[in-house]
Amino acid sequence: MRRCEEPQRRNRRDHHRDEPVRLGVGHVARDRHQRREDQQRPGVPTVSAQGHGRHRRDEDASVDNERDHPRLSHSVGR
């Protein structure tokens, strides 16, 4: 019985770890996530620079990608 419960609990915890950070999450967790993202791609303005605009920062990143690599543009018709 105990052996059956263990993997389920681990799977549920993994599922929560993979969830994207939502607004309304505590600022400590969001800042930690933000720091990790900034290390991955430097030069992109942080969340604190433009309010809580997560989608807007990703849009700026796609604009940069479009300028540097035209073939990789995800926004068609811009």
Curated annotation (Swiss-Prot):
Location of region: Disordered: 1-78
Entry superkingdom: Viruses
Biased composition (Basic and acidic residues): 28-40, 56-71
Protein name, as recorded: Gene product 34
Species, as recorded: Mycobacterium phage D29
Lineage: Viruses, Duplodnaviria, Heunggongvirae, Uroviricota, Caudoviricetes
